[in-house]
């Protein structure tokens, strides 16, 4: 990872795309934020007219032993159940990927049990669940970096298959707790401000969850100036791998679409490791989780819609894929003012 370089956002390509948009057969700037999205995609890819015929979502799965303390509405075993469901095509993310024409890869980076019998699963297990960070570090620094490398490697493998648009998804019961911890440490917001209902827990359990997060931060004392330290002490394997996918995608000029709260926490880690990643990411939706918009505002990454989502899996990110297709089709398929006879 030390040799990973992030290319600069191409102002030249972005400006060329904006000039092209302004000369198309429509009222100037009349497509609003769709045009902003097209310009951002041009700058990320370095191409005036980018295209994304091959799209992918990489979903990283891991468990969290803090889930054993009742921070989630379901038990830790649901992570494995959903992984098995995803590889069979039965999840929300599967349906949304089919709708968007995107391929889904499901990667075991830290599920509690071994899943040797699961066909179609990408096996990159670094550990058998993150440790309970309310009692000590979730991972060693070496484990965290190994998980980040899994994500970088997956970005490279997807690129080798011809993928030009990526999103990072996740499955991990209890993973809003490390996401809240990361958000609090990196943004300076209070734990209460960034801790929500997650999988649908009642208010008294939200308070319990926030208390555990506060204790974990106090015990581990993560250094906000060292993103890997934060990741190792209060993060988790799938968060690390997601940040790696963002780092890897950015290094290859592949736009990576950021999903909701957990992906936002992973983005904060990726940007902490390589600040240039910020300009190479695409926001998607504003999550119901209170910490999400705090994170995205802190990172300076705009979001494009609010459907009241809080599922994760990469579902909000892949919903943006058809809008991305529409944005780039404007650049490549619309006629110009001159082309319709206007002077």
Q: Residues of each region from the PLM?
A:
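N-terminal loops that bind phosphate or other acidic moieties
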Residues: 1-343
């Amino acid at each position: 990872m030390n040799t990973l370089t992030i290319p600069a956002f191409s102002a030249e390509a972005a400006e060329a795309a904006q000039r092209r948009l302004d000369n198309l057969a429509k009222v100037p700037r009349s497509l609003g934020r769709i045009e902003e999205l097209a310009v951002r995609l041009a700058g990320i890819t370095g191409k005036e007219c980018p295209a994304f015929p091959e799209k992918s979502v990489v979903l990283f799965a891991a468990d969290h032993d803090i889930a054993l303390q009742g921070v989630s509405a379901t038990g830790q075993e649901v992570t494995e159940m959903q992984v098995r469901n995803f590889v069979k095509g039965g999840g929300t993310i599967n349906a949304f990927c089919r709708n968007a024409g995107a391929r889904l890869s499901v990667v075991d980076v830290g599920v509690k049990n071994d899943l040797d019998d699961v066909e179609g699963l990408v096996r990159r297990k670094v550990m058998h669940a993150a440790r309970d960070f309310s009692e000590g570090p979730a991972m060693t620094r070496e484990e965290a970096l190994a998980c980040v490398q899994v994500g970088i490697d997956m970005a490279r493998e997807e690129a080798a298959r011809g993928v030009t648009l990526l999103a990072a998804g996740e499955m991990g019961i209890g993973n809003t707790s490390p996401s809240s911890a990361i958000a609090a440490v990196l943004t300076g917001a209070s734990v209460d401000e960034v801790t929500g209902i997650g999988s649908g827990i009642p208010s008294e359990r939200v308070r319990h969850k926030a208390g555990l997060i506060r204790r974990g931060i106090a015990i581990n004392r993560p250094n906000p100036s060292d993103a890997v330290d934060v990741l190792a002490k209060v993060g988790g394997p799938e968060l690390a791998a997601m940040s790696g996918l963002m780092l890897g995608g950015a290094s290859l000029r592949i736009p990576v679409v950021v999903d909701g709260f957990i992906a936002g926490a992973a983005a904060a880690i990726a940007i902490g490791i390589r600040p240039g990643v910020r300009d190479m990411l695409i926001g998607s939706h504003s999550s119901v989780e209170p910490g999400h918009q705090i994170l995205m505002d802190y990172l300076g990454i705009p979001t494009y819609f609010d459907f009241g989502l809080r599922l994760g899996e990469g579902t909000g990110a892949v919903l943006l894929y058809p809008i991305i297709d529409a944005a780039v089709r404007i650049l490549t398929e619309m006629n110009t003012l001159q082309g319709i006879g206007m002077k």
